Amino acid sequence: MAKPKHLIPLSGNYTVMKNFVILLLLIIPTWLFAQSEDEYYRIETIPIPDSIVLEVGGLAFTDEGKLGVSTRRGEVWLLDRPTSARPVFTRFAHGLHEPLGLAYRNGSFYTTQRAEVTKLTDNDNDGVADRYRSIYSWPLSGNYHEYSYGPLFLPNGDMLVTLNLAWIGYGESPVKWRGWLLKISEDGNMTPIATGLRSPAGYGFDIDGELFYGENQGDWIGSGRITHLEKGDFAGNPAGLNWSQEPDSPLRLKRTNIPDSVGLMHEFAKNISSMKPPTVWFP
């Protein structure tokens, strides 16, 4: 019987062709991903004058496309045409206490200093803030590790702030509300939301508006992680429970309820309803 003409006998080139096809299938998704990634994320190198030391703590764009930059040294700089070859730098604010976060809303910048959320407004439109308004403040013990982060705006205009624990050889909360996530309104009302935080430097919303925060490895935190936070949650480090018995605390878990012993977090969560295990662990 004659072989159909459309059937081609396999030869030694089949293995080469198979390997080529496999390689092509591996490359195509990578190429497509690279193309789509570039649509959303692009690295811009901004030239900085030698006379300015930024040590960036926060970034926020104005409605006009200017870039606000808060610095660890206590300043906020405003960059006009930030992606051009020669952006114009103007010192918008100074004299702040280590502002680690910046947001822009309704014509004003908001930043979180070590001890307060501050609203910075340029009333006379000269490019420099002439009003520094304290929205809400909290106590400090003076410990070097009491960093404060934010704010992050909610759709209704309320702000979220996270407060680092102090460090005395281990994480501690010597003053309210260290180790907590706080919600603060524009008129200065504060609501404690969640605790168990150690060094919560980064947080944001997912596509559904749910809040997640990134945690830094350390005591009670075996490895870096991302955790979904809701009101009344306990994220694992017990130091912030020093303030769980305050009248406005959303949870009543006590520090003594968390044994200082070997154990796995998800096992503790079976018996402690407010404990929130991480969504993602980082190696």
Regions found by a protein language model. Give the residues of each.
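Bacterial Sec-dependent N-terminal signal peptides
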Residues: 4-35
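Beta-propeller domains with acidic blade repeats across secreted/periplasmic ectodomains
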Residues: 35-283
